[in-house]
Amino acid sequence: MAQFDVHRNAGRHKDGIPFVVIVQSSQFKDYRRRVVVPLVRADAISPVRFRSFNPAFTIKGVAVVLHPLEIVSVPTERLGTKVGSLADSDQIIVDALDELFSRAWK
């Protein structure tokens, strides 16, 4: 389970949120939980106002949008199967998370 791996959402909201992406650093790989950001179906979310905060991806033919405001920690055993990786888009994801934690809007 590496940073930016994409897993199926095995939870009860899997219809609208089919996937999650692991965002926590591999430094914490021995911890039994993973910090993930939901990848919400593009057709199940209101129009995106900030593309840099909610970048779009296609996973297994499904158009999804990163939803950093729903970031969560889940036990590793609750993650579904790995279906891919967004490591090639790592900077896009980190930039979205930087916006979430920005102090520029005090």
Which residues does each predicted region cover?
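Short N-terminal helix-initiation segments at or just after the protein's N-terminus
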Residues: 1-7, 42, 82-85, 100
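C-terminal terminal-subdomain/extension
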Residues: 57-106
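Compact nucleic-acid interaction/catalytic patches
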Residues: 3-6, 10, 14-56
